[in-house]
Every structure is written in C-alpha cells, then in structure tokens.
From Swiss-Prot:
One of its GO terms (molecular function) is GTPase activator activity. Can form dimers. Interacts with ZNF224. This is DEP domain-containing protein 1A. Its main location: nucleus. It comes from Mus musculus. Pfam families: DEP (PF00610).
C-alpha cells in the first residue's frame, strides 16, 4: 500500500475498508494447497493471510507499527464475515477464523463498499430530499426496515389483515369523512406539532424542547409564511406599514442589480455606491431588534453548534448519522478487542496517530511557511489544556467585537479597564508614550500566533494582564451607546475613519458566551465553539516607528474557545478552524440547511421578508465582479458579513453574544439563502395528511388526536409457554385437517389416487373426526370394490385303478 495520509472527511472508515481490501486481494499470494488427499488451487491458509496482512498494516502509514497480530486476526474475521474471503468450501458470514492452516480463497464478487451518493437534485429541491422520510416520520420505523422472508412477510400479512378487518368493522364511521369539523385552534396545533416533529427528526434529538420551547412556535406566522409568497418565494405583506420603506427597497435594488439598475441619465458621482450602501446599512442597524429576533437567538446558534460538533454516540438515530473521528489512543488489551463488533470502529481504532505530525499539519494551516515559527507554535499548542486563560487581538477594522476572551479569574482584570456597554467588560485605555508607539504589546495565555518581520520588535507583557494592549491616542473617543444600536457594527464611514487614523485602535474585551444548556442525556455542557478569525491591523503610513516601516505585517488574531462534548472526549488544541473554513462539517451541511429552513418559518412575516431581501442583495453584491470596491482594504463579502451580522443575529443580553457565530451564520445564510428561505412543500403535505386523518373520524376527541395523531399498527403479542404449546398443536392439526379436506374434495384426483394419498398419512383422530361413521366414508367411496369371483373348482377325475 502506498504511504499516504489517513483519509479525511466523511465515510472515512469506508475509504479505509476499500483501500485495505483492494490491497489484500491484489497482493495476497495464492498457490496450491493439499487438504484431505485433495488439491486446491488459488487459495491460502489462515496463517499465510495473517502474516501477510500483519506486515501490510504495520508498513502502512495509516495504521503504523503498533498494530498487533490479534487485531489483524480480528480484521480477517471481518473479511470473512463480509465475504471478502471465504473458506475453501464457499462458506462465509461468520467469524470462524483462527491462526491455523484452514484454507481460504477469494470470491468472485468485489468486496468494495459503495459510498452514499448525493444527487444534484437534492441541492435544488427539498421535496426530493424528503421523498423517503416524509411519510416515514408518520410511520413506525421498523415497517420500513428489512425483515426476514419467513417472519417479516408473515407479520406484515397478519397486520394487514387486522387493519383491513378494523376498517371493515369501522366502515360506518368512515362513510361520511367530512362530518368531523376541525376548529382553527386544532389546525394551528397541527402546524405546531408537525414543524416541531420534523425539526426533531432532522436534528435527531430525543426532544426538541431542548432547543425550542413550544410556546415560541406561533402557527399563524408559519401559515402566513407558507401561503403568502411571490413567484420568487419572497413573503408578501398585507400590511404595508411593516414593509421596508420605498427608498430602502430602491437602494437595495440599485446595489443588487448594479450596474444594470444604474440609469446613465441620472447623475452619479464618485462614491455613489458607498453612500447607497451606507444608507441601507444604517436602516438595518437601527432596527429595534435583529431580523432573527431575540427569542430565537439560542435556537439558531445551537443548531450550528449541534450540527458542527456532534458525535456518533450522541446521534443514535435519525435520518442523518455521522461517523465519529476517534481521537483516543489505541488500546492493546486483548479483552477490549472483542468489543469491536463494528467493522468501522475496528478500522478507525487501527489508525496510526502521530501527534507531532498532527500538530505540525495544524500549524501549517494557521501560519505561513516559516519552519522555525511552526515548531515554536506547535510546542505552545501542547500547553492548551494546562492554561486556563486566553486572549485575542483587537479587530481594528470593524466596530464589532470578535474577540472571545475567557478569564478564569475575574480579578485578573486590571484597574485601567473602564466599563463601556453591557456587552463589553471593558476597554483598555492607557496613555501612549514614545516608547509604546514603537511597538505593540501582545500577550496570549493559550496560543500566541504572530508573524515577525526583521524590523519588528516584541515587548513582553506582564502576566497579570492577559489582554492585548493596542494603544490609542489620548484624544481617542469611546462612544457610549444605549439600546440595540450601541454595539452595532461600524458602517463604511466608520471603517474609513479607522483607516484614516481618526480612530487608531480600540480594545474590546468580553467574556465567552454559553451556547448550549446542559443536556440531560449527555450530563455535560456544550460550552463554546471552536473558531478562528484572521485580522489585518491598520498601520499608519506616516509613522516613523519600526512598525511603520513594516506596513505589510499581518497580525493574526486567534479567537478560540472549546466545546466540551463529553468528559471523556475532548477535541485537541490543534483542531481549530481557520478563518476560511466553514463552521459546519461537510457531511452535516444538509442537516443545517433543512433545520434552518424550518426555523426561518418561525419568524414573523415582516422579519422573514426583510431577511430574504437582505440575503438576496448581499449575495448578489458579493458575487458581482462589476461592483466597485466599497472599502479600500476589506473585500465586499467580508464587508457584508461584518456590517450586517449584528442586525441579523443578536441576543438580548449582549454579554452572551458570540459575534463570531453571528458572522458565521450570516456567511452560511449567504451561501445557501435560496434553499434556506424557500417554502418547504413537504411540510404542507404533511399537515394536510394529518388534518385529513382527523377529518375521517379516526380520532373522536381532538385533544386525543393531537397527542396521539398517528394510526396504530398491530404487532405480535407475547404469549406464555402454555399458550404457545396449545397454538402449536392446534395450528398443526388445523393444517392437517385442511390437507385432508383438499384431498377429499379434489376433483382432479381419481379414487385410486385419493386412497394412495390418504394411506400416506396416519392421523386417526383427525380422520375419525372427518369420517365419524362408515356411512360417511362410504359416501366418499361410493364405487364398491369388485370382489373377484373364486376360480371354479374342477373336480379331479377319479383314476380308475387298473387292477381289478
């Protein structure tokens, strides 16, 4: 096998399986063997297979020299069970393989496993995606699973007969299906129930109430958002007072269709598009509450966190299952090897984990190609679990605070931190002297990532202040705000002022947010997300300091927090995401899209309409190559995200706000807004089916129908041993009696054939029950057998004696 890195991404175990089985079939030597005075060609013994596969796994970089011989035997047993190999007589399916001279061979079929394919139509419509699961949600799951031919077919027929019998007996109730009247309250309760059960099924949660309170679901909003839409799927408001102002719609249309909507007859000037964008941004940033509302903040954030960092053990059921990426070290105890009943778990447990290589690879993703700096950073990453404080650099290019600073000791804050707003713990305000203007003081308690030029000097900071000190002028203003606008993102004008050094720097610090409530099924808390954002500082061109000479220096800010999924499984420090990576894992992207699609239906219609129009505008602007630059140093996409993240997602108590997640959510909405903000047709069909079930009179009480709205199915009832013995005898006797009756009443059999068949069986009790008297038996055999006449007795003639 070629030495290469372990496969990444989804279906990791399947890739390893295909790689190992292919190499084993290609490289395993075959020859003739003799067994029991018989020769077999193209086969191998178990010892030969174990030796060859053992050397293969130890020499492969994916598994390494730590693989034991017992693990190799167990993998070969999986080969035998999955028909990769078979014994010399063609038997397979069990794990009866030992370290002996038993002969095996390769079957003609391929052992490769197919990957689950995602068709392109899935991304275009949700109807096809839920084609298999729409009806499955309202059915018991074991009906869709494969059952054995003998038992499953018998049970299904039995259930069908019982259901048909119940329908016949209740025929009178179903003659007039429209007699059952449904009130508006019942319809609303059905909408609430259906959307919550779909959301619970998509996320594979035992209870959706962990994320969403049923009282927060307003059915009127859902029904309005589903029914009142344009041909493009945008909500149409009946009350125009809640709609966007006309001048805002015109401005958004101007930028969305730039430059087509820009009439050449109208006089424009340089920077016209910037002023239009500033007008739109000011309107959305001055809204009384974010578009996703305050009450749904935890719902949207938790969906991203759950979809991005959930493990296999947490998702034991559902329409989407995830393979866990094992991070624990190998266990060589032979008693624990028997616990690998899954082939995937066995393959993943054999993976070779080189910690130094993992840390080096993660460092390369965070740093440039500076080998010496990578080694220093890798050593610092090992101290992640030993440090309990972290700090991050200031975002000097936008007004939003993207820093996630965790302080285990509140007394560590220095006295020069002044309170600003409720969402910020303080602002570092220090007088600037000549020595401080020549250097920036950086300190991080967990990861200190920086790029050092030859002309840049670093000054160490005291350990008592685990914060970045980005110095500002004495006359630098620190505006105090009130309300939702107080911590909104800076507009284009504010960002230009930063670039013109009207504001040289700000230090915004706050505590990390608690994302998820404690889960009763995990007995652990999901604390914080793991993320990183890369920032570029503003360096003054007219400065005579050493920092001014190195104007191209890039200072990276690492915003890192951890998610504790369980006490036994912690992600390593090297598994942070870079700023260009998505918060969600690729195989969970579809889960997040469909979950967010349902969550956006819960929004009030005015908010949903504004969100739809805003996402359409910023998506077109970020993809428009003809759009002039709205900012000299920030790209259009980054500017859209930084500007509108606060007006899309924000929490009421801003201490708990995680701005990085808000930015990631806006970025995710921009990329998938067409799918997320479209109307799911399967939801309407499910509600209609549910209401039709209630109308047919299957539910007498509306309350009972809403609690148990699904039809019940019959299953095998457990019986006692005595009843089983009685049924065994009665069933057998009934079958024999039926056979006797078929023979008796058969018109195709002759009397001779009937007698022959009856003589083959010997059940006198059943026969006597069928023919209690001889008359009844004679009626069956009416043709009496002919008795052969005795031969004529010829008298022998007397032989007269010759003697006289």
């Amino acid at each position: 096998m070629e030495r290469q890195g372990a496969p990444l991404g989804p279906y990791r175990a399947t890739k390893l399986w295909n790689e190992v089985t292919t190499s084993f079939r290609v490289g395993m030597p075959l020859r003739k063997h003799r067994q029991h005075l018989k020769k077999y060609s193209n086969c191998f013994t178990a010892v030969e297979a174990i030796d060859w596969l053992y050397d293969l796994l130890r020499s492969n970089s994916n598994f390494g020299p730590e693989v034991t011989r017992q693990q190799t035997i167990q993998l070969l047993r999986k080969f035998l069970k999955n028909h990769v190999i078979e014994d010399i007589k063609g038997r397979w399916g069990s794990e009866s393989l030992d370290d002996n001279n038993q002969l095996f061979r390769f079957p003609a079929t391929s052992p490769l496993k197919t990957f689950p394919q995602r068709h392109t139509e899935i991304k275009k419509t949700n109807t096809e995606y839920f084609s298999k699961d729409k009806d499955g949600i309202f059915k018991l799951r074991n009906l869709s699973q494969k059952t054995s031919k003998k038992r499953g077919l018998h049970f299904s027929q039995e259930n069908t007969e019982k259901i048909n019998h119940e329908r016949i007996t209740n025929e009178d109730l179903e003659i007039a299906p429209d007699n059952q009247e449904i009130s508006q309250e019942d319809v609303e309760e059905v909408w609430r129930y259906v959307i919550m059960i779909y959301l619970q099924t998509i996320l594979s949660l035992p209870s959706i109430e962990e994320l969403l309170n049923p009282n927060q679901v307003i059915p009127q909003y859902i029904m309005y958002n589903m029914a009142n839409t344009s041909k493009h799927g945008v909500v149409i408001l009946q009350d125009k007072s809640d709609d966007l102002p006309h001048w805002v719609l015109s401005a958004m249309k101007c930028l969305a269709n730039w430059p087509r909507s820009n009439d050449t007859n109208n006089l424009t000037y340089v920077g016209f598009e910037r002023d239009v964008f500033k007008t739109i941004a000011d309107y959305f940033l001055n809204l009384p509450e974010p578009l996703l509302t305050f009450e749904y903040y935890e719902l949207f954030v938790n969906i991203l966190v759950v979809c991005g960092y959930i493990t296999v053990s947490d998702r034991t059921s559902g329409i989407h299952k995830i393979q866990d990426d094992p991070r624990s070290s190998k266990i060589h105890d032979l008693s624990n090897l028997n616990s690998f009943k899954s082939t995937e778990c066995l393959l993943l447990s054999l993976l070779y984990k080189d910690k130094s290589n993992e840390e080096l690879d993660s460092t390369k993703r965070l740093q440039r190609n500076d080998q010496g700096f990578q080694e220093r950073c890798a050593k610092k990453m090992q101290l992640d679990n030993l440090r309990n404080r972290r700090a991050s650099a200031n975002d000097i290019m936008g007004g939003s605070c993207h820093n996630l600073i965790g302080l285990s000791n509140t007394n560590a804050l220095s006295s020069n931190i002044k309170p600003r707003c409720s969402s910020l713990e303080g602002i570092v305000d220090r007088p600037v002297n000549s020595s401080e203007k020549k250097s920036s003081i950086f300190y991080q308690s967990v990861l200190n990532i920086e790029e050092q030029n030859s002309k840049q000097s670093l000054v160490s900071a005291p350990k008592q202040t685990p914060l970045f000190n980005l110095h500002s002028d004495e006359n630098a203003q620190q505006p105090h705000c009130v309300g939702f606008n107080r911590t909104s993102a800076l507009t284009v004008q504010d960002q230009e002022e930063l670039c013109n050094e009207k504001y040289k720097s700000k230090q915004l610090c706050r505590s990390q947010s608690l994302l998820l409530r404690s889960s009763t099924r995990q007995n652990s808390c999901i604390n914080k997300p793991v993320a990183e954002i890369i920032m570029k500082p503003n360096v003054g061109q007219g400065s005579t300091s050493e920092l001014g000479e190195s104007s191209t220096t890039i200072n990276k800010r690492l915003c890192k927090s951890t998610i504790e999924l369980s006490e036994k499984s912690l992600p390593p420090a090297a598994s942070v995401l870079t700023g260009t990576q998505s918060l969600l894992q690729p195989h969970l992207e579809r889960v997040a899209i469909n979950a967010l699609q349902l969550c956006c239906l819960l929004l009030p219609p005015p908010n949903r309409r504004k969100l739809q129009l805003l996402m359409r505008m910023i998506s077109r602007m970020s993809q428009n190559v003809d759009m002039p630059k709205l900012h000299e140093q920030i790209g259009t996409r980054s500017l859209m995200i930084n500007t509108f993240s606060r007006c899309v997602l924000c929490c009421a108590e801003e201490v708990d706000l995680d701005e990085l997640l808000a930015s990631r959510l806006v970025s995710f909405l921009m990329d998938h807004h067409q799918e997320i903000l479209q109307v799911p047709t399967y939801l309407q069909a499910a509600v209609e089916k549910h209401l039709d079930y209630i109308k047919k009179g299957n539910v007498k009480n509306h309350g009972d129908g809403l609690v148990v709205p699904l039809p019940t199915y019959s299953y095998c009832k457990q019986i006692s041993a005595k009843e089983f013995d009685e049924q065994k005898i009665s069933t057998s006797q009934a079958a024999i009696a039926e056979l006797l009756e078929n023979i008796v009443r058969s018109k195709s059999l002759s009397l001779k054939e009937k007698r022959r068949k009856l003589k083959q069986k010997e059940y006198p009790l059943i026969y006597q029950k069928r023919f209690p008297t001889t008359e009844s038996e004679a009626a069956l055999f009416d043709d009496k057998p002919t008795i052969k006449q005795p031969m004529l007795n010829l008298r022998n003639p007397k032989l007269h004696s010759l003697r006289y």
